[in-house]
């Protein structure tokens, strides 16, 4: 597989691009390679779709916890997006084990409840993992909102998916003051052939058949990108994360979601077309 992949680490000084826009993000406004918040995919903006961003105050600053596009008709997030940087990578608290609760930003009638999980044979699987947000108690508690939950089989949730989450956290926590890892996670809820089933045969409660991640790493003035696509199964096809890797373009084809659309077009096109597993420590 690796022989067929091209390296996509791109150094800005080698790109014949004039960067004139700036990243409009309160967490990091010193970048000039994007026209908006980098981690956000393009919104579908359907009649039942709601865009939500949760924030916390950390060290006296307003910090983005995570963002989501939530489909009220399916009681499930289409995706969750967040970042690891010099602030948000910090591990100042442990898992809160706060009671799972309704997201105050969305009407509770549009959210799932405990009975939709355990009694149906599914874990309340975090999309933005508890271990992704450990820089404050408040942000960790936000990860327990039901809008951040997805019905996952226990062997998947505590198996290959957990392994991938741990690897991504390792990459994210390697960030220095000039680095950022942008992360998008989700489960498939839009295409019928990508739905595993429905909780209690209720069409408003789909169970994703696949889960994915899209990653963009800015390290100094260089960039790299990679994606992962996993079938939601009790038995993984492989225990090696490298076997689930693909390009961002390939993930977009599968999901119908446009990832990292706020990047400068030339940079986006180059990064998303290819990937290199060798560029990601611990993957091979």
Regions found by a protein language model. Name each.
Residues 22-284:
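Domain-level detector for secreted/extracellular nuclease and nuclease-toxin modules, and
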Residues 1-32:
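Bacterial Sec-dependent N-terminal signal peptides
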């Amino acid at each position: 597989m690796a022989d067929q992949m091209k390296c996509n680490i791109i150094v800005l000084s080698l790109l014949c691009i004039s960067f004139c826009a700036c990243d409009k993000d309160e967490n990091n406004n010193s970048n000039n390679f994007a026209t908006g918040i980098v981690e956000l995919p393009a919104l579908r903006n359907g009649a039942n779709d709601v865009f939500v961003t949760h924030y916390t105050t950390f060290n006296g600053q307003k910090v983005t916890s995570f963002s989501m596009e939530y489909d009220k008709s399916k009681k499930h997030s289409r995706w969750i997006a967040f970042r690891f940087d010099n602030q948000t990578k910090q591990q100042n608290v442990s898992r809160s084990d706060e009671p799972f609760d309704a997201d105050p930003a969305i009407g509770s009638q549009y959210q799932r409840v405990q009975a939709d999980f355990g009694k149906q044979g599914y874990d309340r699987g975090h999309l933005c993992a508890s271990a992704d947000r450990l820089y404050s108690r408040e942000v960790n508690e936000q990860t327990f909102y039901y809008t951040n939950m997805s019905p996952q089989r226990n062997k998947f949730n505590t198996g290959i998916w957990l392994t991938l989450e741990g690897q991504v956290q390792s990459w994210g926590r390697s960030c220095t003051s000039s680095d950022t890892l942008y992360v998008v996670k989700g489960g498939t809820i839009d295409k019928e052939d990508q739905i595993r089933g429905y909780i209690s045969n209720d069409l408003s409660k789909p169970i994703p058949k696949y889960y994915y991640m899209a990653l963009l790493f800015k390290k100094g003035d260089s960039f790299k990108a990679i994606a992962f696509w996993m079938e939601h199964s009790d038995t993984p096809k492989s225990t090696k994360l490298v076997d689930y890797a693909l390009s961002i373009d390939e993930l977009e084809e599968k999901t119908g979601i446009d990832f990292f659309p706020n990047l400068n077009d030339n940079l986006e096109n180059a990064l998303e077309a290819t990937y290199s597993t060798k560029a990601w420590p611990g993957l091979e």
